[in-house]
């Protein structure tokens, strides 16, 4: 998925 935050797993 395309998350807004870079600290979360894809």
From Swiss-Prot:
Record GO biological process: regulation of blood pressure
Keywords tagged on the record: Hypotensive agent, Metalloenzyme inhibitor, Metalloprotease inhibitor, Protease inhibitor, Pyrrolidone carboxylic acid, Secreted, Toxin
GO terms for cellular component: extracellular region
GO MF term list: peptidase inhibitor activity; toxin activity
Entry annotated with the keyword Secreted: yes
Positions carrying Pyrrolidone carboxylic acid: 1
Tissue expression remark: Expressed by the venom gland.
Domain of life: Eukaryota
Localization terms from the record: Secreted
Its job: This peptide evokes transient hypotension (-11 mmHg) similar to that evoked by 0.5 ug of bradykinin, when injected alone into rats. It has a high bradykinin-potentiating effect (113%), when 60 nmol of BPP-10e are coinjected with 0.5 ug of bradykinin into rats. It inhibits angiotensin converting enzyme (ACE) activity with a K(i)app of 16.21 uM.
Record family assignment: Belongs to the bradykinin-potentiating peptide family.
Protein's UniProt name: Bradykinin-potentiating peptide 10e
Taxonomic source organism: Bothrops cotiara (Cotiara)
């Amino acid at each position: 998925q395309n998350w807004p935050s870079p600290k979360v797993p894809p």
